[in-house]
Amino acid sequence: KEYKLIWHDCDSFDELKGKDLQQSYGVCFYKDKLVIVSNNGKWSLVGGHIEKGETPEEALTREVQEETNMKVLKQIPIGYQEVINPDGTTIYQLRSFCLVEPLGEFVSDPAGSVTEIKLIDPKDYKKYFNWGKIGDRIMERAIEIPKIVI
């Protein structure tokens, strides 16, 4: 048995109320650059696990500060990944567009595994991570948002 991943575009996470929300990750932009983090030697977006009692927005705000020492100025839902586990249970992994700004110098998170951050041209993301069609859709949505909203 395998994991089944289904991507859903959305502009709000309201439809997921009461569901098993596991992750909140942001496609974070500082000015026109994409913020990525090196986590255990692998580059990825900023984010992580939603703690008990946290909203997805609170979790992402906390993760952004812990991993990058940046502040979230704006958060807009992009969509979510529905993950159907081999045992038939389903969890949800949320993705949002974020505008961020540094609070100060980057300091490696002592409690975490992020050792480096980079600001890259968003079009170059595949040089750092490639998540197939779902990853392409996440990035496509995130890159479009500033043209619409900002």
Where are these regions (language model features)?
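Acidic, metal-coordinating catalytic segment for phosphate/diphosphate chemistry
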Residues: 1-25
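Class I (Rossmann-like) S-adenosyl-L-methionine-dependent methyltransferase catalytic domain
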Residues: 12-15, 82-84, 145, 150
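Conserved hydrophobic "DFG−1" position in protein kinase catalytic cores
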Residues: 26-28, 119
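Conserved Nudix-box catalytic region and its N-terminal flanking loop in Nudix hydrolases
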Residues: 29-67
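A short coil-to-beta-strand element that immediately follows conserved catalytic motifs
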Residues: 71-79
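Active-site-adjacent beta-strand/loop module that shapes the phosphate/pyrophosphate-binding cleft
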Residues: 81-105, 118
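Nudix hydrolase/Nudix homology domain
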Residues: 111-150
